[in-house]
């Protein structure tokens, strides 16, 4: 059963323990104990670069055409009212009200107190809003998200809109153990040769996601 907004708020009080765990996991005698929490089977993320130079031409925002198929093909979509990371950290640099977009069957089971179901057009508008706010989109399949919301882990996927100051994944990359890097990949936009020759920076028909970074 999915968790109520009040329960999620209570669980978020434990948020500071996450940073402590990142640091403890770097200690040799604790790394073996905490390593299961950093396995790809429990947590996977792909960070999609924003505003990077493509094909030697102008700098463009690529994520939208890469993320749109995920949104369009999902069986259900749910927009969370507030970013868990920015809410827990008290972010002052970016809007906390731009929350994660959950996709898949489990998204339909999120407690409506946490946000709202979304149509394809509403979900795509939310993605665009996150990009315009300067947030970095990250495709995440994290057991923590499923646990805190009380939804099935294997039936969900999330598109998070991350800031460098509060994102728990980015904090883990900076402060966590080497094993944390195994759970995160850097997406890369790759264009077909004919588009490069034509000087086209980016467009949906020629843009594909290369998860190998």
Specify the residue positions occupied by each region the protein language model found.
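Short Cys/His-rich "knuckle" micro-motifs
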Residues: 170-172
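Iron-sulfur (Fe-S) cluster-binding modules
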Residues: 1-142, 147-159, 175-213
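Conserved hydrophobic/aromatic pocket- or pore-lining residues that grip, position, or stack substrates
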Residues: 162
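Short functional micro-motifs and their immediate structural scaffolds
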Residues: 167
């Amino acid at each position: 059963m999915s968790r109520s907004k009040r329960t999620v708020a209570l669980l978020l009080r434990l948020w500071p323990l996450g940073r402590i765990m990142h640091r403890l996991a770097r200690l040799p005698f604790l790394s073996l104990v905490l390593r299961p929490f950093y396995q790809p089977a429990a947590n996977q993320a792909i960070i999609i670069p924003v505003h990077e130079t493509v094909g030697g031409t102008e700098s463009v925002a690529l994520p939208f055409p890469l993320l749109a198929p995920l949104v369009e093909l999902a069986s259900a979509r749910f927009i969370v009212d507030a970013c868990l990371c920015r809410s827990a950290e008290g972010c002052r640099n970016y809007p906390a009200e731009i929350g994660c977009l959950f996709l898949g069957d489990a998204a339909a089971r999120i407690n409506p107190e946490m946000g709202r179901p979304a149509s394809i057009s509403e979900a795509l508008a939310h993605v665009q809003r996150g990009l315009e706010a300067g947030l970095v989109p990250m495709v995440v399949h994290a057991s923590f998200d499923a646990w805190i919301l009380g939804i099935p882990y294997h039936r969900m996927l999330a598109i998070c809109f991350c800031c460098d100051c509060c994102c728990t994944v980015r904090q883990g990359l900076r402060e966590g153990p080497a094993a944390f890097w195994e759970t995160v990949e850097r997406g890369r936009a790759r264009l077909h040769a004919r588009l490069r020759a034509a000087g086209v920076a980016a467009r949906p028909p020629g843009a594909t996601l290369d998860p190998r970074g």
